[in-house]
């Protein structure tokens, strides 16, 4: 980021219009070494394992910031839509932040994973009564909803699961548009907020949770030669947790 615009000067460098993003405007990091701007490089303790820490620097800070954007307070409820590579980390961050968690997904293995990570309630998002169950469990709806899922029904469901004056934070990037149930948004005064990765401050905080052992991504190391196969598996939705490519 430029460090000189109104966004950078107020701590919102992720909104800088002149920022560079690896894999987009500059080369990515499918390499043994990469050049980074020192002021924007995260600091890791010598004791950490790079393979297990790698997802924290992307998925971790993304969901941590997304949870902060819901403005849910300790003791309140958040619903996390999607328990995949992002969502399984989000459950852990939410619990570490003192929040009660309802996890939604469509696979029993994902729901079992959410329960094992501390979710107070894990529900099949396809069930006819899932919204009613969320409303009942949370006493009127979640105070915050984090949407990591990329299916259009997940967004409408997120609005339905939110209580009045809740904030729905969107971190997933699905193709196309998400239809908005505007009647519910207006009537319940729900805030819908996009969130993209996180700032340097967010990154430092996300790393701290992981270093203290409160958050640990499920990582499968794979050799770099498998890169194309891994990408195919990602597109097919066959990856649980995260994969770290090793050289």
Positions of PLM-derived features:
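Glycine-rich phosphate/adenylate-binding loop and adjacent beta-alpha elements
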Residues: 1-41
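A generic alpha-to-beta junction signature in SAM-dependent methyltransferases
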Residues: 71-72, 138, 161-163
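C-terminal hydrophobic helical "lid"/dimerization subdomain
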Residues: 156-160, 200-247
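Rossmann-fold NAD(P)-binding glycine/threonine-rich loop
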Residues: 172-188, 200-206
């Amino acid at each position: 980021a430029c460090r000189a615009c109104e966004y950078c000067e107020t701590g919102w460098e992720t909104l800088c219009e002149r920022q560079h993003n690896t894999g987009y405007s500059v080369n990515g990091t499918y390499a043994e070494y990469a050049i980074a701007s020192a002021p924007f490089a995260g600091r890791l303790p010598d004791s950490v394992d790079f393979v297990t820490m790698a997802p924290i620097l992307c998925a971790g800070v993304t969901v941590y910031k997304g949870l902060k954007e819901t403005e849910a307070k300790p003791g309140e409820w958040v619903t996390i839509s999607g328990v995949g590579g992002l969502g399984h980390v989000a459950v852990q961050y939410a619990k570490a932040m003192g929040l009660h968690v309802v996890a939604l997904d469509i696979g029993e293995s994902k729901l079992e994973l959410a329960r094992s990570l501390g979710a107070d309630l894990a529900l099949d998002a396809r069930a006819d009564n899932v919204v009613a169950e969320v409303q009942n469990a949370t006493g009127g709806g979640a105070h915050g909803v984090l949407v990591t899922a990329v299916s259009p029904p997940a967004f409408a469901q997120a609005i339905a699961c939110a209580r009045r004056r809740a904030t729905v934070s969107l971190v997933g990037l699905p193709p196309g548009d998400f239809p908005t149930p505007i009647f519910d948004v207006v009537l319940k005064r729900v805030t819908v907020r996009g969130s993209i990765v996180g700032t340097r401050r967010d990154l430092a905080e996300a790393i701290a949770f992981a270093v203290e052992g409160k958050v640990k991504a499920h990582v499968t190391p794979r050799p770099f030669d498998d890169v194309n196969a891994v990408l195919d598996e990602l597109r097919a939705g066959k990856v649980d947790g995260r994969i770290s490519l090793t050289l």
